[in-house]
């Protein structure tokens, strides 16, 4: 229904201006004319305002209908280009992505475990092989059992426990012998030093005493096989040669420096960085045989060495 706005129509009635009427009267009684003006005013009432309103017009109703077609997806039956998701659960894409990520993490974890196991096994095999070669060189039965089954530690605990104490003592003695005897930090007698004089001969003699003490300790160690010693035949020869040289120490260098002809003593003094052994052994024996003559020709350092060793009295 359409409604219209009704505007009232106003009709204006036109009117004329009022007329002015003038009347003149004359009188003869006074012989004087008198005029009186009578004004007559005619007035009209105001026009009436009439309003007329049109009646409301009847609205016409019209009805229209719109036809909408329903959209239906194509059927998946027999269509290879459309995925049939009717029989699949919700969130299939998320499940597939999570499965792929989980498979990647599981493969990384398996690879790490396998690599750690293989590296540990390789390390244990090498360590047991080296131990069997170094510590059990003479024991063929023990080394064969270790090499055949390197992870069977329980069978070898009894053998290793018996020899472990002796091997630890042997290694400690080797480390003590390997220490430099001429290092003042390692020498315990330097703490009680009363003078600033340093005598190489005194240090050699003190090292000889300590070495003999360690050697007596080493002889008490029970070793059933000489092959347990770590070292070769050349190292044993050098050790014996060093013992012989320490048993007869040479005197300090005199002003007449002569080259030594013995190659073994030369190598020994080069290793220890000392100036001993530059004079032949015969001069040392001659000095010990005739102390009075040697006293006239020996250097002041040699005289102080003799005083410290008790061979000379001031």
UniProtKB/Swiss-Prot annotation:
Region (Disordered) location: 32-59, 240-309
Membrane topology type: Single-pass membrane protein
One GO location term (cellular component): cellular bud neck
Transmembrane portions of the chain: 93-113
Basic and acidic residues biased stretches: 254-269
Keyword Transport on entry: no
Modified residues (Phosphoserine): 148, 254, 274
Subcellular location as annotated: Vacuole membrane
Family: Belongs to the PRM5 family.
Protein name as annotated: Vacuolar membrane protein FOSTERSO_4058
């Amino acid at each position: 229904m359409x409604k219209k706005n009704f505007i009232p129509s106003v009709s204006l009635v036109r009117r004329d201006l009022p007329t002015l009427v003038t009347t003149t009267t004359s009188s003869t009684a006074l012989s004087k004319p008198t005029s009186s003006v009578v004004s007559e005013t005619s007035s009209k009432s105001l026009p009436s305002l009439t309003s007329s309103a049109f009646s409301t017009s009847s609205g016409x109703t019209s009805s229209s209908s719109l036809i909408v077609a329903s959209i239906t997806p194509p059927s998946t039956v027999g269509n290879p280009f459309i995925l049939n998701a009717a029989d699949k659960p919700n969130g299939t894409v998320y499940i597939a992505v999570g499965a792929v990520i989980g498979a990647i993490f599981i493969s990384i974890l398996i690879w790490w475990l396998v690599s750690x196991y293989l590296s540990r096994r390789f390390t244990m095999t090498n360590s047991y092989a080296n131990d069997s070669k170094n510590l059990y060189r003479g024991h063929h039965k023990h080394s064969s059992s270790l090499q055949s089954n390197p992870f069977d530690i329980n069978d070898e605990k009894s053998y290793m426990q018996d020899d472990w104490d002796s091997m630890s003592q042997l290694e400690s003695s080797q480390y003590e012998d390997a220490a430099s005897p001429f290092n003042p930090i390692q020498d315990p007698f330097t703490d009680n030093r009363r003078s600033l004089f340093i005598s190489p001969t005194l240090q050699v003699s003190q090292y000889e005493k300590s070495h003999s003490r360690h050697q007596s300790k080493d002889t008490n160690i029970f070793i059933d096989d000489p092959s347990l010693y770590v070292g070769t035949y050349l190292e044993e020869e050098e050790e014996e040669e060093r013992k012989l040289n320490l048993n007869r120490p040479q005197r300090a260098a005199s002003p007449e420096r002569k080259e030594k002809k013995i190659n073994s003593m030369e190598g020994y003094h080069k290793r220890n960085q000392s100036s001993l052994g530059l004079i032949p052994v015969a001069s040392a024996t001659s000095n010990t045989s005739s102390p009075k003559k040697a006293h006239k020709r020996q250097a002041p350092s040699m005289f102080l060495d003799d005083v410290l060793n008790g061979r000379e009295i001031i």
